[in-house]
């Protein structure tokens, strides 16, 4: 079975929704940021500090190559920048969790914002959000409104995948 690939801006709920899909759909969840943190033994912030954004993006590219060669029937929750710098379409069916920037801000606590290096300046984060939207749209096969509950979104994505299998 093909992978389900979740893309969207930081804080759009990719990991949370991925967990719901995994539970409902008999798949396992792979969060690319968590995989990188475990492999490197550092937080995303620490990786950014030690190798910079370009170094982090190279690590993401290596992970994509590994995932594409070795993983099937999974839910892959990508980091927010992964589809900006890498083609993720060959990992599986790509779903963009589309939410307004304001909805994302409401969802994230201050502590969660501090864990995200690109959220250190809200106006820059908003600009980045606006720049990335068109790329998310190009990379995705499906655009899903991310303002519903995680369970509702997970069910919608599974429904889309069921239709893909039938076709």
Curated annotation (Swiss-Prot):
Catalysed reactions, as listed in the record: shikimate + ATP = 3-phosphoshikimate + ADP + H(+)
Keyword set includes Hydrolase: no
Family: Belongs to the shikimate kinase family.
Protein's GO biological process: amino acid biosynthetic process; aromatic amino acid family biosynthetic process; chorismate biosynthetic process
InterPro entries xrefs: P-loop_NTPase, Shikimate/glucono_kinase, Shikimate_kinase/TSH1
Species of provenance: Helicobacter hepaticus (strain ATCC 51449 / 3B1)
Name recorded for this polypeptide: Shikimate kinase
Molecular function terms, GO-annotated: ATP binding; magnesium ion binding; shikimate kinase activity
Matches recorded under Pfam families: SKI
Underlying gene: aroK
Enzyme class: transferase
Metabolic or biological pathway: Metabolic intermediate biosynthesis; chorismate biosynthesis; chorismate from D-erythrose 4-phosphate and phosphoenolpyruvate: step 5/7
Binding-site residues, ATP: 8-15
Entries under HAMAP family matching the protein: Shikimate_kinase (MF_00109)
EC number(s) stated in the UniProt entry for this protein: 2.7.1.71
GO cellular component, one term: cytosol
Disulfide bonds: none
Location within or outside the cell: Cytoplasm
Record CDD domains: SK
Keyword tags: Amino-acid biosynthesis, Aromatic amino acid biosynthesis, ATP-binding, Cytoplasm, Kinase, Nucleotide-binding, Transferase
């Amino acid at each position: 079975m093909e992978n389900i690939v979740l893309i969207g801006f930081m804080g759009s709920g990719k990991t949370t929704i991925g967990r719901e899909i995994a539970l409902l759909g008999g798949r396992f969840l792979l969060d690319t940021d968590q995989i990188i943190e475990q492999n490197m033994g550092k937080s995303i912030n620490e990786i950014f500090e030690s190798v910079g954004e370009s170094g982090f993006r190279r690590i993401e590219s290596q992970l994509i190559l590994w995932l594409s060669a070795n993983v099937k029937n999974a839910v892959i929750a990508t980091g927010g920048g992964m589809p900006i710098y890498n083609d993720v379409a060959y990992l599986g069916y790509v779903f963009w969790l589309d939410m307004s920037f304001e909805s994302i801000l409401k969802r994230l606590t201050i502590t969660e914002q501090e864990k995200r290096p690109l959220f250190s300046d809200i106006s820059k984060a908003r600009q980045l959000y606006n720049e990335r939207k068109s790329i998310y749209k190009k990379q995705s096969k499906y655009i899903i409104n991310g303002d519903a509950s995680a369970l509702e979104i997970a069910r919608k994505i599974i429904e889309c995948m069921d239709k893909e299998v039938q076709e």
